[in-house]
Amino acid sequence: MIQNILRVVFGSKFERDLKKLIPIVRQINSLEESIKGMDDSTLSSQTKKFKERIVQGESLDSILPEAFATVREVSLRTMGMRHFDVQMMGGIALHGGNISEMKTGEGKTLTSTLAVYLNSLAGNGVHVVTVNDYLAKRDANWMKPIYDFLGISVGVIQHDMDHEQRKVAYAADITYGTNNEFGFDYLRDNMVSHKDHKVQRSHFFAIVDEVDSILIDEARTPLIISGPSDEATDKYVRVNKIIPKLSEGEDFEVDEKARNVLLTEKGVSHVEEILSIENLYAPENVDLVHHVHQALKAHKIFRVDKDYVVQQGQVVIIDEFTGRPMEGRRYSDGLHQAIEAKENVTIAKESQTLASITFQNYFRMYDKLAGMTGTADTEAEEFKKIYNLDVIVIPPNVSVQRKDSPDRVYRTEKEKFQAILTEIRELQSKKQPVLVGTISIEKSEVLSKMLASAGIQHNVLNAKFHQKEAEIVANAGKPGAVTIATNMAGRGTDIVLGGAQLYKENLETWKDEDEIVKQFKESILRQNLEYAESLMQKMDSGTKQKRASEILSSVKIWKKNHEEVLAAGGLHILGTERHEARRIDNQLRGRSGRQGDPGSSRFYLSLQDDLMRIFGSDRISGLMKWANMPEGQEIESKMVSNAIARAQKRVEGHNFDIRKHLLEYDDVMNRQRIVIYKMRNEVLENEDISPLISGFIEETVENQIVTHCEGNNPSAWNLESLKEWSDGLDLNLQIDEVEFKKSKNPQLSLFEKVSSTAKLKYESKAEKIGKDIWKLLERNIFLDILDHRWKEHLYSMDHLREGIWTVGYSERNPLVEYKLQGFRMFDTAIENLKNEIVNFIFRVEVSENSKLPEEKKEYKKVGQEITGGFQEFSGGNLNRSQSNGSSVTVTTSSGGGTERKTSRRRKR
């Protein structure tokens, strides 16, 4: 109601956003003629002038109109592409730290150059984030001529790069890379033992391409650096064998909405009988409950060719949003091992977390964050609440001509597929290309078999054939082409009507500087083929004429195909099922009708589809039965469309709640991570950490006095225990209660005496060993102990989170309990850390003749990178005594401290 009133008074949000953007665009346009009049040298020197103005205190906002006008002119001169006004709007929105929603084919990559260039002038580095290595490299190379002309350096991060290559890439003004690489490099930077080993600079400004995919679809995916665990894998095989013996409905119940499986009372008894145990929920069987639960999910919730595929003896997760395989990614909490046992492949050992972060918390570290996508408006609430990002919808340069037809709904999946087959045959007969969207490999293969049986030639794009992705997408716009794509596989590559424009690659690789060749290339790009043909005749060699002839021939073939597809109605999108998120459906539709091209779309649904079956309304099914509809008859009505929209909104709301809830849990770890990494960086950045150690000594002394000598009555003190502690540090402390009885504040006097004695001992030790050796030694001791304690704490927190759900049975809030217990555990871990560092510092011994060990400067990589499976809650718990007393093998800090640490441990 309030929104409607505001809309009447102030206009819609879209209108309000445009009112803010249009005056700035006019200001940019007013500068176009003066910028156009500059020669190349003057134009390229603009960067230097802008930087000087920033140094003098001018803001980026005030430089924006000139900077954007400069980029527009440079783009035209170097690449032949001039930014449209709507792209200027997109660039302004990005610079403001917003999400620019721009439809497919509107030129998001070119739009980003505006905000990227402007923010690079600040000198703090700009990160451009893409969904895969290919797009990072493609976009960086594609836009590089603009940046090169302006004297702005560009770096690209690729998965297979070594440490030194990464340092060079991050040192550039602009760095392109994937969300995974940026996140993992951040974690690794917080595991190094020397500040020069860090690769990233600051987190100043990031533009995230396909922002909905990264910040929403992958929000529940933690990045994890792990080390090996000693846990055996035979338990997974043992538990896997009992699942086929359990009956659904009697022993367990499947909750498809929550994607969960719950044991019944009868099921618990049955499991106890099969495993020959008395009580499944006895403390010693906590892990067993967890593994039974995960095995049930592996068998009853997770399906092969839908959630994962088995390739070369390995279980590979399928991205539910793109249909792509996610190599190297594993489900967490033993679920992946349970699926491996189910599929009878080699079971990998569970790993132990050394460092982790979610994309939600990584990207919230940036001073300014922005994003681009074709579909963000439906998730505007989540972007605002989680990331404080506004979605600004940018109007298309040319209005969309695509015709979106109403959904057709059938009673059964069989009827639906028959109708789809009929429609595809009809479309292909008139040479209209069709992109068929499915939500799983399983469904795409069912449809593929039906098409093959009907003699319809087609291509399939899913996780099993993703290597051919670029080629299949490039040809999806050919006359009569039928392409089956799982979800949004191929996103990031435009489907061009008429098929791949191969001649463009030929033009780009033809580097001849001859003036006639240049004119020929320009006329081809403008589709002026008659003039191009006359230029070909004037070329001075047979070799040039032959190449020009090949290009002309290729253009003519494409143009003929292009016109044929236009006449047939453009690309038709045929959705075989509605996705849980409207945004994914909109992405599929958005593949058609780019830049004013004609196109059409329609979704075919059945009451047996997952969305309709699990979340849909029973009224639709009842209506179809009541109407006594014959087999094969479809229904098109507003009521059905509204019911589907409501179902999708319910699922979107449910998924948002899950992501928000998980973030509240992850925020607990994030606050702790910030404290640890800040402490670590303080050690790395300072050669002399004696002030930090002195503070630890004071805290340790204070804790010992509070523990053993409470209050101001010396007669009640346990001086013997205090003396025992001080002897362990070799303090040679002489104390007698008599000397403190006359003091006005006996406890304070005791603290001052013990503290000053400890500090004198600390200083004399540094003098004896040699200050240079001592500085290096205590920094290495600090980092080794910090990394070890942090790893142990992560292990304990993982198990706390895994079992915290059980407090719900006693009517306590699991999140509140997790925060309370997590805080207590962290407080204890920090106290133990300080005590251990002080104890180690006082006990370490180095012979008098020791020389300063040469500090190792080479970088050493530690741990395995895992993009974890979706975070989720599971059964099973670990009691506090087990988690706090865990024995974890110490691993070296990255950076090469192994030899030094070994020698210190021996001396200790």
From Swiss-Prot:
Q: Identify the residues that bind ATP.
A: 87, 105-109, 494
Coiled-coil residue windows? none
User: What's a Pfam family in this record?
Assistant: SecA_SW
What gene makes this protein?
A: secA
Per the similarity annotation, which family is this? Answer: Belongs to the SecA family.
In its UniProt record, which GO terms are filed under biological process? intracellular protein transmembrane transport; protein import; protein targeting; protein transport by the Sec complex
Q: Which organism is it from?
A: Leptospira interrogans serogroup Icterohaemorrhagiae serovar Lai (strain 56601)
- PANTHER family, from UniProt? CHLOROPLAST PROTEIN-TRANSPORTING ATPASE, SECA INNER MEMBRANE COMPONENT OF SEC PROTEIN SECRETION SYSTEM
Annotated membrane topology: Peripheral membrane protein
The region called Disordered is annotated at 871-908
Q: Which InterPro entries match?
A: Helicase_ATP-bd, P-loop_NTPase, SecA, SecA_CS, SecA_DEAD, SecA_motor_DEAD, SecA_preprotein_X-link_dom, SecA_SF2_C
E.C. numbers = 7.4.2.8
* Name listed for the protein in its UniProt record: Protein translocase subunit SecA
Q: Quote the SUPFAM superfamilies the UniProt record gives.
A: Helical scaffold and wing domains of SecA, P-loop containing nucleoside triphosphate hydrolases, Pre-protein crosslinking domain of SecA
Per the entry, what this protein does is: Part of the Sec protein translocase complex. Interacts with the SecYEG preprotein conducting channel. Has a central role in coupling the hydrolysis of ATP to the transfer of proteins into and across the cell membrane, serving as an ATP-driven molecular motor driving the stepwise translocation of polypeptide chains across the membrane.
Q: Where is the composition biased (Polar residues)?
A: 874-884
**What PROSITE patterns has UniProt attached to this entry?**
SECA, SECA_MOTOR_DEAD
